[in-house]
Amino acid sequence: MEFSVKSGSPEKQRSACIVVGVFEPRRLSPIAEQLDKISDGYISALLRRGELEGKVGQTLLLHHVPNILSERILLIGCGKERELDERQYKQVIQKTINTLNDTGSMEAVCFLTELHVKGRNTYWKVRQAVETAKETLYTFDQLKSNKTEPRRPLRKMVFNVPTRRELTSGERAIQHGLAVASGIKAAKDLGNMPPNICNAAYLASQARQLADAFSTNIITRVIGEQQMKELGMHSYLAVGHGSQNESLMSVIEYKGNPNPDAKPIVLVGKGLTFDSGGISIKPAEGMDEMKYDMCGAATVYGVMRVVAELQLPLNVIGVLAGCENMPGGRAYRPGDILTTMSGQTVEVLNTDAEGRLVLCDALTYVERFEPEVVIDIATLTGACVVALGHHITGLMSNHNPLAHELIGASEQAGDRAWRLPLGDEFYEQLDSNFADMANIGGRAGGAITAGCFLSRFTRKYSWAHLDIAGTAWRSGKNKGATGRPVALLSQFLLNRAGLNGDD
C-alpha cells in the first residue's frame, strides 16, 4: 500500500474518495463544512435527516455529491470534538481503512490528519495513521491453502496536512511509520508461526537473513549448546534439555553510530518457541497459545528491522534467546539446583518459571558488550496479566532515568507501559534454603518477584524489564500476535537518535 502527503483544498481533489470527519451530535468538521458549503448544504441536509449521528466509528458513504470532483465522500464519526484523543483517533482511522477496503475504494485522500487530537502534532497524526492502516490490513495466511482478498483492495492513501510547511514533517512521519509498521509485521509473523516451524533454529535463520538484507550495518552470530556449555550458561541449557530442538541464542549486532567507541543499547528477548511448562506441565486448555512465549524475541527481531530500515545513528545489539521447554527423560526437574553463568545458584521450584532461567544467563552474557543500557522483553508472568490486564505492559528497572524514558516513549507511541516497584520485601520471597535463590517467590506479587530475580543478574549496567505477558497476543476470535512492544521500543530508539518528530 502506498502512502503520501499533500496540502490542498478538499473541493479540488479528483480522488476516488475523500475522507472527512463528523463530530457528535451531527457537527461537521472544518473540512466537512467546506465540502458542505460547496455542495449547497447537501451534507448537512443528510445529517439533519438523521443519516449520521457522529459517534465514533459510524460511517456514511456518499456518491456523486453536487459540485464535488471526487467520486465519493466518506463521512466518519469521530465522537465529541473535545474528547478526541489518541485511542479514539486510532479507532477512527481503523474504521476508515476497513470501510475503504470493503467498499472497493482503491485510493483516497484522508483529511482526518487535520483533526485536532489533544497534545498531538501533524507528525504524530500522520505516523499513527500509517501504522494503524498497516495494522488494520494485516493478515497471516501464509499457511492457508485458500486465501481470500478484497475484490478491489485499498492501494493508495494520501494524507492531507493543513499547511505546506508541514509537508516535510508529514513525509518524515510516513517514513518512520512504514518502518515501525514493518517491524510490527515482522514480529507478528514470527509470533503467529506454529511451533513445529518456528523453533530456535528458525529464529536463528531469520536473524541471519536480516544480516544478509542489511549487510552494511548488521552482523549476526548464533551461539549453540556446545558454546553455551563452554560459557557456563547452565541455567539456559537446563530449560531446553527436555526438547529435541537445540537451544540457540542469536546475537544481532547493528552498528550505525559514527563513533565506533559508542556503547551499544542491548535488547534481550525471551524466545521460548513453545512452553509446555516442562515437568510442571501446563493445563491443556489454551496450551496452543504457548507458541507466543517467544514474542519477546520476536519483538527484538522487529525492532532490529526498524533500526536497520531507518539507519539510525546508534549501536544496537539484539539477542534472541531461543529455546523450547518440554517434558522428557532429560528434562530438568523441580528440586534441581542450577549454576548460572554469573556463578549464582538457583533452586528450581517450578519448571514453568523457565523464562527467567533463560534470561538470567543471556543478561549475564551481554555484560561483555559494556552496554549503555539493557532492556529485556519477555512474556514472563501471568501475574502481570492479573495486575495490568491485556492493555498495559509491565515495566521494572534499576535505573530511574531509563524507566522514565521508556514510559515517555510508551505514551508517545500509544503502546503503554506502567512501572512496578522492585522493593526489598519482594527479594525476600526468593530466599532458598539450598541455593542462592529460588526461581519463584510465591503467588503474591509474582510479576515483581520475577523482575527481582532478573535484577540480580543486571548489577553491572542500567537495566529495564518489560513483561509483555498480557500485551503480546490476543486470545479468542481475534487470536494472534499484536507486535507489541515494537512501537514502544522503536520510539525509545528514535528519541535516543534525536528523531522524535517534535516540530
UniProtKB/Swiss-Prot annotation:
Pfam families registered for this protein in UniProt: Peptidase_M17, Peptidase_M17_N
Record's subcellular location: Cytoplasm
Annotated positions binding Mn(2+) 2: K270, D275, D293, E354
Listed transmembrane segments: none
Highest taxon of the lineage: Bacteria
Binding site for Mn(2+) 1: D275, D352, E354
E.C. numbers: 3.4.11.1, 3.4.11.10
Molecular function GO terms recorded: manganese ion binding; metalloaminopeptidase activity
Active site: K282, R356
SUPFAM superfamilies from the UniProt entry: Macro domain-like, Zn-dependent exopeptidases
Stated family: Belongs to the peptidase M17 family.
Primary role: Presumably involved in the processing and regular turnover of intracellular proteins. Catalyzes the removal of unsubstituted N-terminal amino acids from various peptides.
Protein name: Probable cytosol aminopeptidase
